[in-house]
Every structure is written in C-alpha cells, then in structure tokens.
C-alpha cells in the first residue's frame, strides 16, 4: 500500500514548483535499461549499465512536480513510460503511480498514460489495468517472425514472436488501444509491402515506423540504415497503404503527422518540430536528459532533486542541438522543410548533415503531392478533406 504521508516526509523541500512557460513532456524510464529481451540493435549498453527500479519516494516527487510544473492552462497531462521493458517495474508500481496522479491532478485536468512495451510480458492483469485507466500502448515488433526472432530474441537467444503475438491478442480481447512500433533497418527495405500486410493482419489500426539509430549495440552489430533504404521502405509503406484503400481504417502515424503538420504548421513529433528540447527523459535514478537518443554527459541536465523542472526545460530548449536543427542551408531551400524540419539531431553525421535526408525527401515528396493544391491553413485542410471523402485511393 502506498503511504503518502511517509513519502511527503521524504520530499526535498521546495517552496513551490514554478510552472514552465512552455509545454513539455518527460519520458519516464522507471527501470532504466532493464529488459527481458536482447535486441541486437538496442542503444542501451545493458552489460555495463547498472539497473535500479525507481523507488516510491522518487516516483512521488516526480509525479507531484511534473503535474505542478505544467504551463498554466494545461488541460491534459500525459505520462509516458518506457524502458528497457517498463512492465518489469511490476503492476504495483503503476497502481502507485495512478494513485499519485489522482491525488495531485488539479480539478478539470485530464491525466493520460502511454506505455511502450515489447509485449511479451502482457497478461490479463496488465490488460485490465490498461483498460480501466485508458492506457495507450505502443508495442515494439519486427515486420515478421523471421526478423523478430533474429533481431529481437530473449536473453537466452530464443524466439519472442509467439509471446509478442499473445500480448497483441490479449490487448484485442480486452479492447486496449495500441499501436505497433516498428524499427526499420536495411534488411527490411525491399519488403515494405509484405511487412505492411503482415502487420495489418494482426489487427493493428495504428502503425509507426522508426529509423534505426546507429548507436550502442547497433554500431557493434553493424547496423546502419541508409537514407536510400529509409526512403525506399517508407514509400513502399505509403504505396501499399494507398493500394489497399486503408485510409480511415489503418493509421500510419508517419503519414498522418506529416499531413497534419502541412496544414497546421505544428508537429506531433519532436523529430520533425522546428526545434526540439521540450521532450525530456528521466532515468530511474532521477537523472534528466535532453533527449531519449542523446543520453550522455553532453546532454545531461542534472538530477530531478537538483533543480526545478522549469529550469531543466529551459536548459534543454537552449541546447544548441535543439535550436539549430533545421538551420542548415540545404534545409532552408528544401521543398519538404515544412514537414521535415531537418529531422532528429541524433541522426547528424560528422559534417552536420542528417544521414537520412535523402530518404525523408523521397518519402515526404510522395505523400505531400496530393496536398500541394491546397492552402496550408485550416481552410485548405477543410477543402482537402472534402475533396477526398470517399476517394481514399487517390489521397
């Protein structure tokens, strides 16, 4: 049972947690890099990094202060839980988190939770928790069984495909909303159509594709996604999605976010925002970092108990990588800059260029073609929607 009174006595004194002047999110890693899988491309050096589960005192401090530091007028506060494998924290951990959220949430503010998992530990008890509290689940999966078993084995080198599919089936049975997250690497480039069909056959309505980061174990294993293969794969997904007339039935987040950004001038992804730095990461020991893919000394912002969250957000926003991500000359004259914005700073090569640039250009050029005749405002959005009602195959 969570002892709120005892936790309050352990709090580091704060006269008041000041509000951040800008919206921000913190991705929480309650068990750090701990995981039951041994993915070949994982960016965490698991053999070298100590693993510690977040204790109750730090969990309470984080939730209390994260809620208090949100900008004035915030109507929804989203908690994102990731790992490693965050389910290793245990059911009781998330029940405590939910109780704390309910205690500290101001009147009129909605609390939501998202969790990214490999799916292999999901059971009925987890699904009941997810369903009752409206969790959105992101489930990492390779494109097919052969890819999954080679690239995402368990700690003993055994297959994880069946366990992941069992988790997906349980999410369906309990009517838990989820999306499939697919890490794209060179081996997949020629098989986009088949991979798309297989993923949709699993009943997935939301798909998200993420380029493989070449860091950590990914470098040691020789992974290096090329710009050509990234573009080739994503165009293949786009064309298969159109061919099957899946608009409105299957939501490919990479496409939907770019389309929304074209008309609204705002991005739902830090990767393609005009600047980044407002999506922080906190490890189980309270260390804050500017970016999930830049967990290193250079981008370390300090501990939760060393500063206010508003100060941490301000420091993150001011880091050069966040300020200058789309200021390169080639970006300024690019015809897809409005939805690309230079991509992720973690993808820059030694010359300061995004190593996926050509792939983004090819993909965005294709998917923006149907939108070009329409003005980039809400009137254009309304006109575009009206023009393509019932003609999903042309969009």
From Swiss-Prot:
Effect of residue 334 to A: Unable to activate AtsA. No FGly detectable. No binding to AtsA
Binding residues annotated for S-adenosyl-L-methionine, in chain numbering: 41, 84, 152
Residue ranges of domain Radical SAM core in the record: 18-249
Catalytic residues of the enzyme: 292
Gene Ontology molecular function, alphabetical: 4 iron, 4 sulfur cluster binding; metal ion binding; oxidoreductase activity
Recorded consequence of changing residue 297 to A: In strain: Isolate 13 and Isolate N2
Localization of this protein: Cytoplasm
UniProt keyword annotations, A-Z: 4Fe-4S, Cytoplasm, Iron, Iron-sulfur, Metal-binding, Oxidoreductase, S-adenosyl-L-methionine
Residues the entry annotates as binding [4Fe-4S] cluster 2: 270, 276, 291, 344
Cofactor: [4Fe-4S] cluster
Gene3D superfamilies in the record: Aldolase class I
Effect of residue 39 to A: Unable to activate AtsA. No FGly detectable. Binds AtsA with reduced efficiency. Unable to incorporate a third 4Fe-4S cluster
EC number per UniProt: 1.1.98.7
Listed InterPro entries: 4Fe4S-binding_SPASM_dom, Aldolase_TIM, rSAM, SPASM_anSME, Sulphatase_maturase_rSAM
Keyword ATP-binding: no
Annotated effect of mutating residue 84 to A: Drastic reduction in AtsA activity. Abolition of binding to AtsA. No binding to SAM
UniProt key word Magnesium: no
Regulation: Activity is inhibited by iron chelators.
Binding-site residues, [4Fe-4S] cluster 3: 331, 334, 340, 357
SUPFAM superfamilies: Radical SAM enzymes (SSF102114)
Effect upon mutating residue 88 to A: No change in AtsA activity
GO cellular component: cytoplasm
Subunit: Monomer. Interacts with AtsA prior to its export to the periplasm. This interaction depends on the presence of AtsA 'Ser-72'. Binding of SAM to AtsB promotes the formation of a ternary AtsA-AtsB-SAM complex.
Function: Involved in 'Ser-type' sulfatase maturation under anaerobic conditions. Catalyzes the post-translational modification of serine ('Ser-72' in the arylsulfatase AtsA) into 3-oxoalanine (also known as C(alpha)-formylglycine (FGly)), by a free radical chemical mechanism initiated via the reductive cleavage of S-adenosyl-L-methionine (SAM). Is capable of catalyzing multiple turnovers. In vitro, use of a peptide substrate in which the target serine is changed to cysteine also gives rise to turnover, supporting approximately 4-fold the activity of that observed with the natural substrate.
Protein name stated in the entry: Serine-type anaerobic sulfatase-maturating enzyme
Organism whose genome encodes this protein: Klebsiella pneumoniae
Taxonomic placement: Bacteria, Pseudomonadati, Pseudomonadota, Gammaproteobacteria, Enterobacterales
């Amino acid at each position: 049972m969570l002892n709120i009174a005892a936790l309050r006595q352990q709090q580091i004194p704060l006269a008041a947690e000041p509000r951040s002047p800008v919206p921000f999110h913190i991705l929480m890693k309650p068990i750090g890099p701990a995981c039951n899988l041994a993915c070949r491309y994982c960016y965490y050096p698991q053999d070298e990094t100590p693993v510690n589960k977040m204790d109750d005192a730090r969990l309470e401090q984080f939730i209390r202060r994260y809620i208090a530091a949100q900008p004035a007028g915030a109507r929804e506060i989203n908690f994102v839980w990731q790992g490693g494998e965050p389910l290793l924290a245990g059911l009781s951990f998330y029940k405590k988190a939910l109780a704390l959220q309910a205690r500290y949430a101001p009147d009129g503010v909605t609390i939501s939770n998202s969790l990214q998992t490999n799916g292999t530990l999901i059971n009925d008890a987890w699904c009941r928790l997810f369903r009752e509290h409206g969790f959105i689940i992101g489930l990492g999966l390779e494109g097919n069984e052969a890819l999954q078993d080679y690239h995402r084995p368990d700690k003993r080198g055994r297959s994880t495909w069946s366990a992941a599919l069992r988790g997906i089936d349980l999410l369906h049975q309990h009517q838990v909303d989820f999306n499939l997250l697919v890490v794209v690497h060179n081996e997949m480039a020629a098989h986009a159509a088949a991979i798309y069909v297989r993923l949709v056959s699993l009943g997935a309505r939301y798909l998200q594709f993420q380029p493989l980061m070449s860091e950590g174990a990914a470098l040691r294993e020789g992974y290096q996604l090329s710009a050509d293969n990234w573009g080739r794969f994503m165009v293949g997904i786009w064309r298969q999605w159109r061919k099957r007339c899946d608009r409105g039935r299957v939501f490919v987040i990479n496409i939907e976010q770019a389309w929304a950004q074209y008309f609204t001038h705002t991005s739902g992804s830090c990767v393609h925002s005009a600047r980044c730095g407002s999506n922080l990461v906190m490890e189980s020991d309270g260390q804050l970092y500017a970016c999930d893919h830049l967990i290193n000394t250079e981008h370390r912002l300090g501990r939760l108990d060393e500063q206010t969250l508003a100060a941490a957000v301000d420091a993150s926003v001011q880091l050069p990588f966040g300020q200058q991500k789309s200021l390169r000359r080639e970006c300024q004259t690019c015809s897809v800059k409005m939805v690309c914005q230079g991509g992720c700073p973690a993808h820059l090569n030694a010359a300061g260029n995004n190593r996926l640039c050509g792939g983004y250009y090819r993909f965005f050029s294709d998917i923006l073609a149907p939108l070009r005749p329409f003005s980039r405002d809400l009137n254009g959005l309304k006109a575009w929607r009206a023009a393509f009602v019932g003609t999903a195959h042309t969009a």
